[in-house]
Curated annotation (Swiss-Prot):
Protein name (database record): Putative 4-hydroxy-4-methyl-2-oxoglutarate aldolase
Catalytically driven reaction(s): 4-hydroxy-4-methyl-2-oxoglutarate = 2 pyruvate; oxaloacetate + H(+) = pyruvate + CO2
InterPro entries, sorted: RraA (IPR010203), RraA/RraA-like (IPR005493), RraA/RraA-like_sf (IPR036704)
Function: Catalyzes the aldol cleavage of 4-hydroxy-4-methyl-2-oxoglutarate (HMG) into 2 molecules of pyruvate. Also contains a secondary oxaloacetate (OAA) decarboxylase activity due to the common pyruvate enolate transition state formed following C-C bond cleavage in the retro-aldol and decarboxylation reactions.
Residues holding substrate: G80, G81, N82, L83, R102
Species whose genome carries this gene: Paraburkholderia phymatum (strain DSM 17167 / CIP 108236 / LMG 21445 / STM815)
Classification lineage: Bacteria, Pseudomonadati, Pseudomonadota, Betaproteobacteria, Burkholderiales
Binding residue positions for a divalent metal cation: D103
Length: 164
Protein backbone atom coordinates (compact mmCIF):
# COMPACT_ATOMS: atom_id res chain seq x y z
CA UNK A 1 0.00 0.00 0.00
CA UNK A 2 1.54 3.29 -1.11
CA UNK A 3 0.37 6.51 0.55
CA UNK A 4 1.51 9.37 2.77
CA UNK A 5 -0.74 10.46 5.62
CA UNK A 6 0.12 14.12 4.97
CA UNK A 7 -1.03 13.76 1.35
CA UNK A 8 -4.21 11.97 2.45
CA UNK A 9 -4.99 14.83 4.84
CA UNK A 10 -4.41 17.39 2.09
CA UNK A 11 -6.55 15.48 -0.41
CA UNK A 12 -9.41 14.90 2.04
CA UNK A 13 -9.66 18.16 4.00
CA UNK A 14 -13.43 18.06 3.61
CA UNK A 15 -13.52 14.71 5.44
CA UNK A 16 -11.30 16.08 8.21
CA UNK A 17 -13.78 18.93 8.63
CA UNK A 18 -16.75 16.55 8.55
CA UNK A 19 -15.13 14.17 11.05
CA UNK A 20 -15.16 11.13 8.77
CA UNK A 21 -11.35 11.34 8.64
CA UNK A 22 -9.59 11.79 11.96
CA UNK A 23 -6.00 11.95 13.25
CA UNK A 24 -4.79 10.15 16.37
CA UNK A 25 -2.79 12.30 18.77
CA UNK A 26 0.99 12.06 18.16
CA UNK A 27 1.75 9.99 21.27
CA UNK A 28 2.87 6.72 19.64
CA UNK A 29 6.29 5.21 18.93
CA UNK A 30 6.94 3.07 15.85
CA UNK A 31 8.28 -0.47 15.58
CA UNK A 32 8.48 -3.10 12.85
CA UNK A 33 9.93 -2.91 9.35
CA UNK A 34 6.91 -1.44 7.58
CA UNK A 35 7.43 2.29 7.10
CA UNK A 36 3.71 2.64 6.46
CA UNK A 37 0.72 0.39 6.87
CA UNK A 38 -2.99 0.55 6.38
CA UNK A 39 -6.08 -1.58 6.35
CA UNK A 40 -9.46 -2.28 7.86
CA UNK A 41 -9.56 -2.05 11.66
CA UNK A 42 -10.25 -4.97 13.96
CA UNK A 43 -10.72 -3.57 17.47
CA UNK A 44 -9.98 -5.02 20.91
CA UNK A 45 -10.48 -3.54 24.37
CA UNK A 46 -8.28 -5.22 26.99
CA UNK A 47 -6.50 -4.24 30.18
CA UNK A 48 -3.13 -5.75 31.11
CA UNK A 49 -4.25 -9.07 29.55
CA UNK A 50 -3.19 -10.07 26.05
CA UNK A 51 -5.10 -13.37 25.72
CA UNK A 52 -7.53 -11.86 23.20
CA UNK A 53 -4.66 -10.16 21.34
CA UNK A 54 -3.01 -13.55 20.74
CA UNK A 55 -6.30 -15.20 19.76
CA UNK A 56 -7.00 -12.47 17.21
CA UNK A 57 -3.49 -12.52 15.72
CA UNK A 58 -3.84 -16.29 15.27
CA UNK A 59 -6.52 -15.54 12.64
CA UNK A 60 -5.69 -14.66 9.05
CA UNK A 61 -5.08 -10.93 8.99
CA UNK A 62 -6.01 -10.39 5.34
CA UNK A 63 -4.06 -7.09 5.41
CA UNK A 64 -6.16 -5.75 8.29
CA UNK A 65 -4.91 -3.63 11.21
CA UNK A 66 -5.39 -4.78 14.80
CA UNK A 67 -6.21 -1.81 17.05
CA UNK A 68 -5.80 -2.62 20.75
CA UNK A 69 -7.09 -0.29 23.46
CA UNK A 70 -5.02 -1.35 26.44
CA UNK A 71 -6.32 1.52 28.53
CA UNK A 72 -3.03 3.35 28.08
CA UNK A 73 -1.45 1.13 30.74
CA UNK A 74 2.28 1.57 31.15
CA UNK A 75 2.61 -1.34 33.62
CA UNK A 76 3.11 -4.26 31.21
CA UNK A 77 3.42 -5.11 27.51
CA UNK A 78 0.49 -6.37 25.43
CA UNK A 79 2.54 -7.30 22.35
CA UNK A 80 6.01 -8.82 22.19
CA UNK A 81 8.22 -10.52 19.66
CA UNK A 82 6.21 -13.74 19.49
CA UNK A 83 2.97 -11.90 18.76
CA UNK A 84 4.70 -9.66 16.24
CA UNK A 85 5.95 -12.74 14.39
CA UNK A 86 2.49 -14.31 14.61
CA UNK A 87 0.90 -11.20 13.11
CA UNK A 88 3.47 -11.18 10.31
CA UNK A 89 2.98 -14.90 9.60
CA UNK A 90 -0.80 -14.51 9.42
CA UNK A 91 -0.79 -11.51 7.10
CA UNK A 92 -1.74 -8.62 9.38
CA UNK A 93 -0.75 -5.22 7.98
CA UNK A 94 -0.14 -3.65 11.37
CA UNK A 95 -0.88 -3.39 15.06
CA UNK A 96 -1.79 -0.22 16.97
CA UNK A 97 -1.44 -0.56 20.76
CA UNK A 98 -2.73 2.03 23.22
CA UNK A 99 -0.37 0.52 25.75
CA UNK A 100 3.10 -1.03 25.73
CA UNK A 101 5.11 -3.51 23.68
CA UNK A 102 8.32 -5.40 24.47
CA UNK A 103 11.01 -7.41 22.68
CA UNK A 104 11.65 -4.42 20.44
CA UNK A 105 14.65 -5.99 18.70
CA UNK A 106 12.36 -8.82 17.58
CA UNK A 107 9.49 -6.48 16.72
CA UNK A 108 11.80 -4.42 14.54
CA UNK A 109 12.56 -7.54 12.47
CA UNK A 110 8.86 -8.14 11.70
CA UNK A 111 7.53 -7.18 8.27
CA UNK A 112 4.54 -5.28 9.57
CA UNK A 113 3.96 -1.93 11.21
CA UNK A 114 3.55 -1.66 14.96
CA UNK A 115 2.86 1.47 16.98
CA UNK A 116 2.52 1.73 20.74
CA UNK A 117 2.76 4.25 23.55
CA UNK A 118 5.98 2.85 25.01
CA UNK A 119 7.99 -0.24 25.83
CA UNK A 120 7.88 -2.29 29.02
CA UNK A 121 9.82 -5.50 29.75
CA UNK A 122 7.08 -7.18 31.82
CA UNK A 123 4.54 -9.41 30.06
CA UNK A 124 0.83 -9.05 30.60
CA UNK A 125 -1.53 -11.30 32.52
CA UNK A 126 -3.37 -14.19 30.85
CA UNK A 127 -6.87 -14.03 32.35
CA UNK A 128 -8.89 -14.33 29.15
CA UNK A 129 -10.59 -10.95 29.48
CA UNK A 130 -11.42 -8.31 26.92
CA UNK A 131 -13.90 -7.34 24.23
CA UNK A 132 -13.69 -7.57 20.45
CA UNK A 133 -15.29 -5.48 17.70
CA UNK A 134 -16.19 -2.56 19.96
CA UNK A 135 -15.72 1.18 19.51
CA UNK A 136 -12.52 2.44 21.12
CA UNK A 137 -11.72 5.90 22.42
CA UNK A 138 -8.05 6.51 21.70
CA UNK A 139 -6.18 9.82 22.07
CA UNK A 140 -7.52 12.07 19.31
CA UNK A 141 -10.24 9.84 17.89
CA UNK A 142 -12.78 7.12 18.30
CA UNK A 143 -11.91 3.97 16.30
CA UNK A 144 -14.78 1.73 15.25
CA UNK A 145 -14.51 -1.81 13.90
CA UNK A 146 -14.46 -1.78 10.10
CA UNK A 147 -13.02 1.73 9.82
CA UNK A 148 -9.73 2.22 7.98
CA UNK A 149 -6.34 2.90 9.55
CA UNK A 150 -3.45 4.57 7.69
CA UNK A 151 -0.13 5.00 9.52
CA UNK A 152 3.29 6.29 8.53
CA UNK A 153 6.09 8.35 10.06
CA UNK A 154 3.87 11.46 10.08
CA UNK A 155 0.98 9.98 12.04
CA UNK A 156 -2.06 7.74 12.20
CA UNK A 157 -5.34 8.40 10.39
CA UNK A 158 -8.74 6.85 11.05
CA UNK A 159 -11.21 6.95 8.15
CA UNK A 160 -14.83 5.90 7.83
CA UNK A 161 -14.12 4.69 4.27
CA UNK A 162 -11.09 3.43 2.35
CA UNK A 163 -8.94 6.27 0.97
CA UNK A 164 -6.51 4.30 -1.24
Amino acid sequence: MNFATADLCDAHEDQLTAGTLRVLDPVFSRFGRASRFGGEAVTLKVFEDNTLVRATLEEKGVARVLVVDGGGSLRCALVGGNLGKLGEKNGWAGIVVFGCVRDTLELNECNLGIIALATHPQRSQKRGGGERDVSLRLPGSVVRPGEWIYADSDGVLVSSAPLV
